[in-house]
């Protein structure tokens, strides 16, 4: 049976075109469309439920810099630091008081973070270790007064000596007291200076202090932030425009901040860091607004990575060089005076938190080398101190991440406060934190079996179709080539047989010589002709025939 060459060629070509168009154009569009419809913050959706109440805790680590030579530093010596940690906590995130605006396609909510001490993961530490840090009230308060309200220095100095009798520039206290339980602030004195100092506690200006009775407060770095309001956000739901999913449009009911001297730095860029839009391009970066810094930060693509066998993109970020980057000059105290810009790798938080604090990467990683040289005990490296995010772009899923940040005191001598008079001027690391997440198989399997399984099936299908179509195209090409380059032997033989049949029906002419015998012995011709032919009817052309015809 003959193979239908034309049909085979057309079918193989159609299969090849279909595999290309469906595998690389139609299927990705269908998949992206399905993801865009599923990944929204519309009430009742699975993503909305996971987003509003994270069903697993994040890992939160504290690393504290213990000052081992506090008395020497008080006299101007170089600080020697000892890193103590990690102190491990489970951080639970939830959002409450959710309000949807269907017209604007937004949802407003209040963020809440709850920290629970994980004693098992903290071992061999217990949280009861004594740490020596800059006095968390005296030093920031004294420096702020010297910079902004120098005329009140004498009153503040006297008030500090009453509220904190015999206090030094550095305080020794247990980790849990400094960070969660609180250190005692006694405002029971009737002295005017003490009452004036305690006014900032009673009015709530010191956000880290909690009033326990009429005359006493407890001060801690994190106690007030634990299981309390962490800010009111308004973000896009992504129902009308999936590309805007999670985008912050308001914080504290304001469309922009009023903290930095230039409007661009006050703009909200990115999400609340708990959700990202699907279908991002790697060059877009991952942007999120960070209330602790009063600033939006963008992570940039670093390299390809993988998580539990699934491909992902590795992103990282840093605080940049505010002085060198013109776009960041609005984070300087005076954008027109670059001398007011913080050193490379740091950010001045004074305008954000109301105190002389600086943010940086842990151990001043990627920062100005002078910052590291000013103290002993730092060892910056990428593995331990860089920020990273392993992100799946198509679904907008962060597989794992480590957000790291260090808080430093912008220390300087304060002439009006005796214990601080001889302090060196430098940026002193106090502690750094890491907020980490690593999705387990329960959640990665959702991505694996809905996204990657579909991609795998599509990949196998399209390459199988391409393979079959190429085989068909090559076979049909072979058939066409064989047809044009070879003889149709059967047709030729049939044509020759027809000619011989006609010749055999002709009546023979009489012999030219009557005396010549009309019977001749035929010459025996070897059968060297084409197989299937009759040697008698097809004599070899090079042999002379006994019988000749006259014309």
UniProtKB/Swiss-Prot annotation:
Official protein name in the record: Sensory neuron membrane protein 1
Q: Where is the composition biased (Polar residues)?
A: 514-536
**Keyword NAD part of the UniProt annotation:** no
Query: Known InterPro entries for this protein?
Result: CD36_fam
Extracellular compartment residues: 29-459
Membrane topology term: Multi-pass membrane protein
UniProt key word Disulfide bond: yes
Q: Where is this region: Disordered?
A: 502-551
């Amino acid at each position: 049976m003959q193979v239908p060459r034309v049909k085979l060629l057309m079918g193989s070509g159609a299969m090849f075109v279909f595999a290309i168009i469906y595998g690389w154009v139609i299927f990705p569009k269908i998949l992206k469309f399905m993801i865009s419809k599923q990944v929204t913050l519309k009430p009742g959706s699975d993503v909305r439920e996971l987003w509003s109440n994270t069903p697993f805790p994040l890992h939160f680590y504290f690393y504290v810099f213990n000052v081992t030579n506090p008395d020497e530093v008080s006299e101007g010596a170089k600080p020697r630091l000892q890193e103590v940690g990690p102190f491990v906590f489970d951080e639970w995130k939830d959002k409450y008081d959710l309000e949807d605006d269907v017209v604007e396609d937004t949802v407003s909510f209040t963020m809440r973070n709850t920290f629970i001490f994980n004693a098992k993961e903290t071992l061999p530490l217990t949280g009861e270790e004594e740490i020596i840090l800059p006095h968390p009230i005296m030093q920031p308060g004294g420096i702020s007064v010297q910079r902004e309200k120098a005329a009140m220095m004498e009153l503040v100095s006297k008030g500090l000596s009453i509220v904190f009798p015999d206090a030094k520039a550095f305080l020794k206290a247990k980790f849990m007291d400094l960070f969660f339980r609180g250190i005692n602030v006694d405002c029971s004195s009737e002295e005017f200076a003490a009452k004036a100092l305690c006014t900032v506690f009673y009015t709530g200006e010191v956000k880290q202090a909690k009033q326990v009775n009429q005359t006493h407060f407890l001060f801690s770095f994190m106690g007030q932030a634990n299981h309390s309001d962490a800010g009111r956000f308004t973000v896009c739901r992504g129902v009308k425009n999936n590309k805007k999913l999670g985008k912050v449009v308001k914080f504290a009911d304001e469309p922009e901040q009023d903290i930095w001297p230039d409007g661009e730095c006050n703009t909200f860029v990115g999400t609340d860091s708990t959700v990202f839009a699907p279908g991002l391009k790697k060059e877009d970066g991952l942007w999120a607004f960070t209330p602790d810094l009063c600033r939006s930060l963008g992570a940039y693509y670093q390299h390809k990575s993988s998580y539990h066998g699934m491909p992902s993109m590795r992103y990282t970020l840093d605080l940049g060089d505010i002085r060198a980057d013109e776009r960041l000059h609005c984070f300087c105290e005076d954008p027109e005076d670059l001398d007011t810009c913080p050193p490379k790798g740091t950010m001045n938080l004074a305008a954000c938190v109301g105190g002389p604090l600086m943010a940086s990467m842990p151990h001043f990683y990627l920062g100005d080398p002078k910052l590291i040289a000013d103290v002993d005990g730092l060892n910056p490296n990428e593995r331990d101190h860089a920020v990273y995010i392993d992100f799946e772009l198509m679904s907008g899923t962060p597989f794992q991440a480590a957000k790291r940040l260090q808080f430093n005191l912008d220390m300087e001598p304060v002439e009006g406060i005796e214990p601080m008079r001889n302090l060196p001027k430098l940026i002193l690391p106090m502690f750094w934190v890491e907020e980490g997440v690593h999705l387990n198989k329960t959640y990665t399997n959702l991505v694996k079996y809905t996204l990657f399984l579909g991609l795998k099936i599509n990949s196998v299908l399209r390459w199988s179709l391409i393979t079959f179509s190429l085989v068909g195209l090559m076979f049909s090409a072979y058939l066409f080539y064989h047809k044009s380059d070879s003889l149709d032997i059967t047709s030729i033989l049939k044509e020759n047989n027809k000619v011989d049949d006609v010749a055999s029906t002709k009546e023979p002419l009489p012999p030219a010589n009557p005396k010549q015998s009309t019977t001749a012995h035929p010459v025996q011709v070897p059968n060297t002709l084409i197989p299937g032919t009759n040697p008698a009817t097809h004599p070899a052309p090079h042999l002379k025939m006994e019988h000749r015809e006259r014309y």
